[in-house]
Regions:
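The feature encodes the CheY-like receiver
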Residues: 14, 56
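Alpha4 helix (beta4-alpha4-beta5 surface) of REC/receiver domains from two-component response regulators
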Residues: 62, 82-100, 105-109
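Short amphipathic alpha-helix used as the core "switch/output" element in two-component signaling
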Residues: 61-72
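Active-site residues of response regulator receiver
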Residues: 52
Length: 124
């Protein structure tokens, strides 16, 4: 079972992601802030992180930069309510980008794609 870290300041989004992604067979751990996410990262190993770009008084990009430095092997998907960032995610060294919506099909597909790619790297 893959462990996912979901970082979003909106409680309803964290709940939605937890419910939907748990149904897909993932273990989902959530955090509402960079501080909380950092604590969760110190407590365990994660296979992938899903980060909201705009957190309350913080930026998911800051956490992404921290993850790139400290956990360069952990894939990260950025999420935003705005599609304008879609062309920038690779420059930020993220592995994927998803526009937030009530339908999590795109997010689920992106998670599956990235985790399959990660497994493929390990088996080569």
């Amino acid at each position: 079972m893959s462990r996912l870290l979901v970082v979003d300041d909106e409680a309803n989004i964290r709940l939605l992601y937890t419910e939907e992604l748990s149904e897909e067979g993932y273990e989902v751990i959530t955090a509402a802030s960079i501080t909380e996410a950092t604590e969760k990262l110190q407590e365990g190993v994660f296979d992938l992180a899903v980060l909201d770009i705009k957190l309350k008084n913080e930026s998911g990009i800051e956490l992404l930069q921290q993850l790139v430095k400290e956990r360069h092997d952990m894939p990260v998907i950025l999420c935003s309510a705005f599609s304008c960032y879609k062309d920038d995610f690779s420059a930020w060294l993220a592995d994927g980008y998803v526009v937030k919506s009530g339908d999590l099909t795109e997010l689920k597909n992106e998670i599956a794609r990235i985790l399959a790619k990660k497994v493929q790297k390990v088996t080569q």
